[in-house]
Amino acid sequence: MTSSAPVGVFDSGLGGISVVRQIRTDLPHERILYFGDSANAPYGTKTPEQVRDLSFRIVEDFVEQGAKAVVIACNTATSSAVQELREHYDIPIIGMEPALKVACDRGHGERQSVIVAATPLTLRERKFAALMHRFEDAHTIHKQPCPRLVEIVERGELDDHDLVMRTLHDYFDQYDLAHTDSVVLGCTHFVFYRDYFRELLPNNVAIVDGNEGTARHLEVVLESLGKLAPEEQDGGVILRNSDPGERIAELAQQLLER
């Protein structure tokens, strides 16, 4: 497999396009195949077995298209499927997890109060429980499932300011935000809400996501294998979705260019 081969990126729907944008910024010569599984969204309310089955189908398709690596741009699919995918395929499988370590490290040893916003399944899975166990003794960590934030993106309602702010208040008004240090956006869909979160949260509260770290991890892995795209290659993105409707295709393109 050559360095000019594409990178496959997938998500339960449209949220992973936020990761594609980061990869395109950091690795502009890479060719990216994006698959959004909007016909089966959301993953966050499915069983781990269902998510694993869907993930294997998608990765198998990427392999058939000659992908040199796959990025699971979905915290939920990472939690449910990444280990088995790595055992089954001989190409790099890059996963994601909520950037809890980044949020806790911001305190430089001081106790941090952190809210992790994610899908219900991500927060229930053993992978997140193990991650949380590493930090919960030294920090105050709140888990906040936010399934409606996924639905708003998938319905194309991201620009409905009143709806979004009302939804955020429903989820976060229960917290003492003035004494919160960070909110972790533990779902790639949620990165599209960054400006809304900034409006909701006091200025001292950091908003943390895992997209930069994921793109950086991909770069390190490809470089170690000698598989970074050649600089003379024109990068690009091909968007595909399990929902064949024109509306989804238009929405995906809008999010890519947002």
From Swiss-Prot:
| One Gene Ontology MF term | glutamate racemase activity
The reaction(s) catalysed by this protein are: L-glutamate = D-glutamate
Which residues are listed for substrate binding in this entry? Answer: D11, S12, Y43, G44, N75, T76, T188, H189
Which pathway features in its UniProt record? Cell wall biogenesis; peptidoglycan biosynthesis
Q: What is its EC number?
A: 5.1.1.3
GO annotation, biological process: cell wall organization; peptidoglycan biosynthetic process; regulation of cell shape
Kindly give the InterPro entries that the UniProt entry links to this protein: Asp/Glu/hydantoin_racemase, Asp/Glu_race, Asp/Glu_racemase_AS_1, Glu_race
Q: Give the top-level enzyme category.
A: isomerase
Q: Which PROSITE patterns match?
A: ASP_GLU_RACEMASE_1
Which of UniProt's keywords are assigned here?
Answer: Cell shape, Cell wall biogenesis/degradation, Isomerase, Peptidoglycan synthesis
Active-site residue list: C74, C187
Q: What function does this protein fulfil?
A: Provides the (R)-glutamate required for cell wall biosynthesis.
Q: Which family, according to UniProt?
A: Belongs to the aspartate/glutamate racemases family.
User: Do you know which HAMAP family this protein is assigned to?
Assistant: Glu_racemase (MF_00258)
Which NCBIfam families does this one have? glut_race
Q: What is this protein called?
A: Glutamate racemase
